[in-house]
Amino acid sequence: HIETVQKIFKELYDKGYIYKGEYKGKYCTPCESFWTESQLIDGKCPECGREVTEAKEEAYFFKMSPFADRIEKLLTETDYLQPKTRAVELVNNFIKPGLEDLCVSRTTFKWGIPVTFDEKHIVYVWIDALSNYISALGYKNEKFDEFDKYWPADVHMVAKDIMRFHAIIWPAMLMALDLPLPKHLAVHGWITFNGQKMSKSLGNVVDPFVLGERYGADAIRYHIMREMALGADSSFSNEIMINRINSDLANGLGNLVSRTVAMVQKYFGGTLPTERESGEFDDDLIETATSLRAKVDDFMDKTQLQNALAEIFKLVSRANKYIDETAPWVIAKDETKKARLATVLYNLLEAIRIACTLLSAFMPTTMPKALEQIGA
């Protein structure tokens, strides 16, 4: 990582995108830190609470303005940023007022990656931290290079509080390096607790390890993705989670699998005969099942995980309804309708197979077990 960051910094400097200038700001002498006006608390250092003074520091800057038009078009004219509603916020707040050049080095501290051609300067957070995404893949590293194999990323997912860094600064860096951008930038909201932001001081932080031990990681993963729409905050509560797990996973999918497997075992000893006989209600279930993958693919491409899961559970609900409509236990009483009974159960098994296969992306531990139950 260190070597890659130094090479990136030098390349940007050689291309004329990085230049030496002067950084001005509020300086805290005890903390040896510069702060912006907005970072101060009551005009004082946000870390130690002491007075700050106006100070200047020699620094290197990264030119942002050459990329303003390209980034604005990227955000407003393509599907790069998801959800799209975030684009207006970024353009109005940061691009329209004019992108300021970015301070990318400091001399007031020594911990960090030194600039190779001016070692009193330490590479500041932007080029250091953001470069992790490509340094980890071996970018500009002769000994280890997986970069071409894995870059560009299909989806780069970040939280809303760091959206600006990844929607404006990171694309500008990549453009300056003549590297492809991630195909999509997905911005998610925060998980709140009963509508409040989680905070240790409030004692409302949810421990995912405790939840995982109690309900299973797959169930927690499912609940979060089912309840959280991309870009919006989601309120977590034990009551909502338990209701969702019970209604969808236990009563919905779990009940469908157990009823179907039990009937296949009871009426055919666990193996269906090959004879088939179509009947009423088949077409609607088959259409719901066969059209599902394309719908889920579309939602997944848009990073709309909540909608993808909702679509899958439409099939689960339709299959449960199909059981009530066809009443296999009634058909089983007529020995001449073995083919019809086998068809009904086959349709149910196929619906389960499709639903569980698509759900495997969300619940990778549980769904293979469900597929094993039906012999898939």
Predicted regions located by residue number:
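Cysteine-rich micro-motifs
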Residues: 41-50
